[in-house]
């Protein structure tokens, strides 16, 4: 079983970094079993996150970036893919996705919904961990995704 942290992103946000790092320590698993999406590996290495999390940087292949631009222009959203699709692709049913990060639900409908949808489609367990949100920012889409989380 592996644990995926798709919304940590990088240590530039110290709250997200602290939640990801402390969660990894609490899981008490080899770092190879804890995979974190990262946009700034040097910063996370400097902060020591690489000691307890396997950091993975994901970039969309050129062909997918072209398809994404065309799909936006032609309004064909079903063809669009994100870094989250590629990051979560290796997930197996026995794996767990942990959405870490303080204020990630305080902004419009975002990647938390997308990552939860991807993991749920794969039959994986999902955990919402260390998150705040304001009632004024609660949308129907967020309510739906909150109900999908297993924990």
PLM-predicted stretches and their roles:
Residues 150-151:
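A short beta-strand/loop micro-motif in the catalytic core of glycosyltransferases
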